[in-house]
Amino acid sequence: RRWCFRVCYRGFCYRKCR
């Protein structure tokens, strides 16, 4: 199963899937 979530760091957001 793949989980995708949004990661925000220092004003920069990206999508992370594991």
UniProtKB/Swiss-Prot annotation:
Transmembrane segments: none annotated. The keyword Lipid metabolism does not apply. The modification Arginine amide is found at residue 18. GO terms for cellular component: extracellular region. Its main location: secreted. Keywords: Amidation, Antibiotic, Antimicrobial, Disulfide bond, Secreted. GO terms for biological process: defense response to bacterium. Disulfide bonds join 4-17, 8-13. Signal peptide: none annotated. Hemocytes. It is found in: Secreted. Belongs to the tachyplesin/polyphemusin family. Significantly inhibits the growth of Gram-negative and Gram-positive bacteria. This is Polyphemusin-1. The lineage of its organism: Eukaryota, Metazoa, Ecdysozoa, Arthropoda, Chelicerata.
